[in-house]
UniProtKB/Swiss-Prot annotation:
It is a peripheral membrane protein. Gene3D superfamilies: Photosystem II 12 kDa extrinsic protein. The gene is psbU. It is found in: Cellular thylakoid membrane. The keyword Thylakoid applies. It holds the Pfam family PsbU. This is Photosystem II extrinsic protein U. Its main location: membrane. One of the extrinsic, lumenal subunits of photosystem II (PSII). PSII is a light-driven water plastoquinone oxidoreductase, using light energy to abstract electrons from H(2)O, generating a proton gradient subsequently used for ATP formation. The extrinsic proteins stabilize the structure of photosystem II oxygen-evolving complex (OEC), the ion environment of oxygen evolution and protect the OEC against heat-induced inactivation. The keyword Lipid biosynthesis does not apply. One of its GO terms (cellular component) is extrinsic component of membrane. Residues 1-26 form the signal peptide.
Length: 135
């Protein structure tokens, strides 16, 4: 008798699992959504990246990580450059107090890789120039 009850329970479970299953249906949102045209939106940071700032290291707006590609700059010399900003001209970076002769030579050799633009709050607010939070 126990075996018969077990057999009927197993058969009921098997039939119930196939019969009671209803496939999920996804909602078609394409008919509900309003058609929209793509719009190019530029904020102040994106607009600045289209200038020379996007191609060179901006001494007034770049963060410390931007100097990693330059040999001998990261982190000490880059930190001095950032601490003494803003600059009026690229050559002003050579007048930073406390630079060694080696550091001045490195700066002189890489002046063409730098640019100077007006400081933008999008890039320099909140001391993000030392730790931009990119990990």
């Amino acid at each position: 008798m126990k075996n018969l009850v077990r057999l009927l329970a197993v058969i009921a479970l098997i039939i119930g699992s196939f019969w009671g299953k209803v496939p999920a249906q996804a909602l078609n949102l394409t008919s509900i959504a309003l058609p929209s045209l793509p719009v190019a939106v530029l904020n102040a940071a994106d607009a600045k990246l289209t200038t020379e700032f996007g191609a060179k290291i901006d001494l007034n707006n770049s963060d410390i990580r931007d100097f990693r590609d330059l040999r001998g700059f990261y982190p000490n010399l880059a930190g001095k450059i950032i601490k003494n900003a803003p600059y009026e001209e690229v050559e002003d970076v050579l007048n930073i107090p406390g630079l060694s002769d080696t550091q001045k030579e490195r700066l002189q050799a890489n002046l063409e890789k730098f640019t100077v633009t007006e400081p933008s709050k999008e890039f320099i607010e909140g001391d993000d120039r030392f730790n931009p939070g990119v990990y």
